């Protein structure tokens, strides 16, 4: 199953939802698709969707999915990576009035640079990016939070030893 995640902010991502509808109607995508569409105004015709989900519903849907297509929300990305799911990030872009700036592009590129996921910036790339995400062996996501905690604990322990 492909799980599309568009988050909870006030911004739409109709461009992606329409493209997925088109791909399903042309049999480019044949597997089940489910979407969390947030505040997008386009309502999919060829796949099921909800606007919003509880955290429990979200986590259960991530677990059932094989691949996630998500806006570039850090929480969504990290949840998918921790669940060892293939991820295609489709960031909202300022030029399409999908966000006020291109910070989602910056986030997507940072995760892609570490080989955690695949980024898709334009509609004509999505089919190839989906195939690439299915074939790629990604690096295992390691939370930087744990590294910071270890550094702090190491520092505290060294300070106590020196006293």
Language model features by range: what are they?
Residues 1-163:
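Nucleotide-activated sugar donor-binding and catalytic core shared by glycosyltransferases
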């Amino acid at each position: 199953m492909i799980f599309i995640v568009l988050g909870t902010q006030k911004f739409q991502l109709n461009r992606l939802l329409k493209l997925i509808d088109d791909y399903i109607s042309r049999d480019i995508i044949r597997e089940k698709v489910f979407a969390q569409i947030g505040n997008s105004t386009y309502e999919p015709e060829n796949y099921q969707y909800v606007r919003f989900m509880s955290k429990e519903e979200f986590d259960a849907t991530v677990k059932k999915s094989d691949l996630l297509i998500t806006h570039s929300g850090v929480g969504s990305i990290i949840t998918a990576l921790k669940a060892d799911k293939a991820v295609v990030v489709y960031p909202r872009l300022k030029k399409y009035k999908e966000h006020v700036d291109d910070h989602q592009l910056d986030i997507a590129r940072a995760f892609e640079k570490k080989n955690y996921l695949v980024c898709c910036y334009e509609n004509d790339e999505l089919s190839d990016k989906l195939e690439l995400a299915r074939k790629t062996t990604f690096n295992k996501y390691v939370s930087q939070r744990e590294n910071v905690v270890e550094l702090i604990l190491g520092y505290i322990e060294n300070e106590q030893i020196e006293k």
